[in-house]
Structure formats: C-alpha cells, structure tokens
C-alpha cells in the first residue's frame, strides 16, 4: 500500500510565499499540512518608529557583534542575488515584468532551517548562506526586525512571521522556543473550517495594507497541519517626488530596440546619486532615495548598450551590492548640492506569482522536497515540502513606491544636467542601505502603468 502524505504549506505575501510540507508517515492518513508566509498582523500591531538612520541602527547593534551582523547580512544578500538571477533567466522568454522579496523568502526558509536536521539542514544552510551558530542567527534577525518595522510620515515598513497550526497538531517544544526569536507565536486554527481561511486572508490583507487581499482558498488549507506565513510590506515616498504635471506619454523600447508602446513616463530633476562605471557590472546605476532618513532607496540598474538584463543580473550575483553602495556613497560625499540629474522613469504596477520549488532545487535545496529524504524532525515528525509559492505586487508612481529613442544613461555636457532615461528594460532593488538587506527586487521589461 502506498504512502499517504500529510502536507505543510508556506506562503509569502506583498509578498506572499508558501511552502507545502507533507508527511510521508504511512500510518498518518490525514489531509495536507501547510505553511504560509503572509503579513505582519499579530507580531507587530504597532511598528516602532525609528530614530535617525544610522544612529538608530548603531543603538540596535550595541549588544550585538557588528561583524556578525554584517556577515549574516552578506549571506542574505548573496542568497537574494542568486535567487534574482535564476528568476531573471526563467522569465526572459516571457518578456514580462516581475518582482520578488528575497528577504521574505529567506526568512520563511529560515523557519524551516530551524526545524531541520541532517542533510536537509546542511542544504538549507548552504543555500541560505548561513555561516554562524543558531543563537547569532536569531540575534541578527531580532536586530533586523527592530529597525525594519518602522512608521514615519514618509516610510512604512512592516514584517511578520506567523505559524498557524491545526487543532491538536504537535510542534516540538524546542522548535516552539526557537521560533520565538523570530517573533512567532503559533496560532491554533481549525483547517477544516472556512473560518481559518478568513482569518489568514484577513491577516494577509491587513499586513499588506490591501495589496494582497485574498490569497488563500479553502482547498489550499483544508485539513492542513501547519501554515507558515512570512511577509514584508513597504510603502515609501520619494525623497524627491515626481511632479505629476510633467508626466507624459513616451515610447518604451524592448531589449532589441523595438517600440513596445507608449506609457506614462515620470520626469524629475534633482540631486540623485549615480554611477556609470562600476567595474564588471555592464550597467548604469541610479539611486532613488525614500523619505528623509537616508536609509531606504531604490537602486536602479540600466544595462549598457549591447547588454541585457540577464547579463546585469548575472554580474550582480558575482559582484554583490557592496561595491555599488560604496560607489554611490562616494558620489554623494563628493558631489555638490547643485549636481542635478534628470530622470525619466515609467509609472508601473507589477503583480507576480511564482512557484519557487524548481528554483530552490537548482539552488541546492533538494532533500526538503523529497518525502524519502526530508528531515524536519526538529519541527515535527515525517514532514517534507510539496510546494513553494511567492506572490508580490508593487506600485510605483510620482509619490513613491507601495512594494524617444533607446538611449544609454550617458552623461551630457556640463551645460545641461546628466540624463538617466529609463525607457527600456531595467532592474531595480529596494535596499536598506546600512545593512545592505535586499528587501525587494524586480525587472521592468514591459511596464503596465500605475
């Protein structure tokens, strides 16, 4: 007689992502167990306001080894750029825009790492670039969550890790203790009742402020054992808002130089930092800051003539963000206050849904998805992952972000401002600059107007 699987699903919103974990116990004939990544409702009912940029982060680090935090942040960044590059390859033929939240995916998988043993744990550790002991990893996450959950007049960031468990389903005490370090308190629900779907969707809707309102269907969780939720919400006003009266219809070009169509292009002239010669990148870099604290920014990379988005994504994977952020910081330090740049950028809305199982297997996380080899015994007995789903949405307009001819971003003569024309495919990353954490990343190939 064949095995009857019990499953666990993970879901992530504004991210929304999900991993479907199953039990291969032949004596257990109950319905699937699910893990979901969603929004920050219960864990952070009132995100803490941050003080001033770097000084706040330094205060959060006062009781934590800065070198360890930098090392772990670098690991998250390496995972993020690896994931971004692989998805870029996947979507190139479809010629579609996409957006992901690498930090939310990483955070969700860390919950599984905490529950894993043996080779499953080794594969997760290697892929997630975890290079420290568990206690230091947990400490780093506490620091991140403290300054990522912020609310000001110009920026709002909120995170959530949540675990819903079926009535009577056991979670091992050591795992329950471990996940408290990620601000997770398991919530017991009845996965056979429609009320569980209502609760998860309401949590997701509230955390993502309505961006991803109703993602879970009754059949997704019916009879589940566990549902893990990890989400990240971001809304930021540009430091230099675009003037709506200047927005105009302009052609947008494909990578081959063909006109895709006319779309609303925003125009702004301000003191933006830019870099045109990062060695090995093959792209021009522009920084669009959010708010007034100089902590969060959209980093835009426009491929140089003769190079494609996949080239840039592959180069970023090798280079990392550090040299780019250092070059941008050096530009800001030496640039005069009247060093203005003219930026033309499309308004766009991107909503994407990914099944990440194949990509994660490519990244070396194999045993997690194999009922014969998966080892999540620190969490509960006999589970394996069935599915990983990731849903995102981003809106970019004149106020900011809520998650002609083909031209290079060449510098004009000194009589006129340099021009950065984003009228052809480009890549963007929303970054917490002090740590280098890559919160969101995506590509615009065929924009839909906001």
From Swiss-Prot:
GO biological process: melanin biosynthetic process; negative regulation of melanization defense response; negative regulation of proteolysis; regulation of immune response
Entry-listed glycosylation sites: 149, 205, 243
UniProt xrefs under InterPro entries: Serpin_dom (IPR023796), Serpin_fam (IPR000215), Serpin_sf (IPR036186), Serpin_sf_1 (IPR042178), Serpin_sf_2 (IPR042185)
Gene Ontology terms, MF aspect: serine-type endopeptidase inhibitor activity
Signal peptide positions on this chain: 1-24
Keywords in alphabetical order: Glycoprotein, Melanin biosynthesis, Protease inhibitor, Secreted, Serine protease inhibitor, Signal
UniProt subcellular location: Secreted, Extracellular space
Coiled-coil positions: none
Disruption phenotype: RNAi-mediated knockdown results in spontaneous melanization of the tracheal system in larvae and pupae. Displays melanization at the 2nd or 3rd larval stage and affected larvae die a few days after it first occurs. Melanization is first detected between tracheal cells and the overlying cuticle, then increases in intensity and spreads to the epithelial layer of the affected tracheal cells. Increased expression of the antimicrobial gene Drs in the trachea and fat body.
Bilayer-spanning residue ranges: none
Main location: secreted
Domain of life: Eukaryota
GO cellular component: extracellular space
Any one Pfam family match given in the protein's UniProt record, by short name: Serpin
Keyword Secreted among record annotations: yes
Family designation: Belongs to the serpin family.
Function noted in UniProt: Serine protease inhibitor which plays an essential role in regulating the tracheal melanization immune response to bacterial and fungal infection. Acts by negatively regulating a protease cascade involving Mp1 and Sp7, that functions in the activation of the Hayan-phenoloxidase (PPO1) cascade.
Protein name: Serine protease inhibitor 77Ba
Organism annotation: Drosophila melanogaster
Organism lineage string: Eukaryota, Metazoa, Ecdysozoa, Arthropoda, Hexapoda
Gene symbol of the encoding locus: Spn77Ba
